[in-house]
A protein has these predicted regions:
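RNA-contacting regions in translation and RNA-metabolism proteins
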Residues: 1-233
Length: 233
């Protein structure tokens, strides 16, 4: 069990029982060495199979797993029986099934979501607990622009960027997050005096002499007029 295959907070004493999954078998010079892993997504899947009978029985399948070992994980599950809620079955009553796995993984937070082949909906679910307002897909590039209300952006990104990183790993899409401006914000205007620290006073006076008092008025004014009348280029 190399250090690279251990959860960062793992600590073991000699003779202590370790739960892990076999990652690979190295056979060098006729000396086989079994390499174990606790950081592999497969380890989390095996723990789920042990804790959730419906997975072991084939009623629920684990479609995808993304992990930052010891920190956070996202799991996408699907049920083959309409009567079974796959997320509820994995979490258990009051979290009874998932809590044992969380403890085994050194308090790794685990989000369980419903899998769907609809990639737009899957991306929205992967970014939970944030609520997505709209998406712009670039399927050929495997990229997506996600628009959220300002108060939802930090939830989508997550602590240390973990939520968006895991969502990208789970969906296999590069996710760019943008703030969605409400209508009031879009309609707001700014008086030129508020730019005094960035723009020379004579420039502001020249623009105002044209009857342009706000930023939007300047943006909507013909470029030729600004150059000719206010001596701006």
């Amino acid at each position: 069990l190399p250090k690279t295959e251990q959860i960062p907070s793992d600590f073991y004493r000699k003779g202590e029982t370790v739960r892990a999954v076999v990652a690979r078998v190295d056979n060098r010079n006729n000396n086989p060495k079994i390499i174990l892993s606790r950081t592999s997504p497969m380890f989390l899947q095996r723990l789920l199979e042990m804790e959730v009978p419906e997975i072991n029985d084939g009623l629920i399948t684990v479609k995808k797993i993304a992990r930052i070992p010891g920190e956070r994980a996202k799991i996408a599950v699907e049920s083959y029986d309409d009567r079974i809620d796959p997320v509820g079955a994995c979490v258990g009553v009051k979290g009874s099934r998932i809590h044992g796995i969380v403890r085994e993984l050194r308090n790794e937070n685990i989000d369980v979501i419903n899998y769907t082949a609809n990639i737009q909906l899957f991306i929205q679910r992967a970014l939970s607990p944030a609520h997505v307002s709209s998406l712009v897909m670039h399927e050929e590039e495997k990229k997506v622009e996600v628009y959220l209300k300002p108060e939802e952006v930090s939830l989508a990104i997550g602590k240390g960027g973990m939520n968006i990183k895991l969502a990208s790993m789970l969906t296999e899409y590069t996710i760019d997050v943008y703030r969605e401006l409400d209508e009031d914000a879009e309609n707001e205007d700014i008086y030129l005096e508020e730019f005094e620290d960035e723009i020379d006073g004579w420039v502001i006076d020249a623009i105002k002499s044209l009857g342009l008092d706000t930023a939007k008025a300047v943006l909507n004014a013909p470029r030729e007029m600004l150059i000719e009348k206010a001596d701006l280029e």
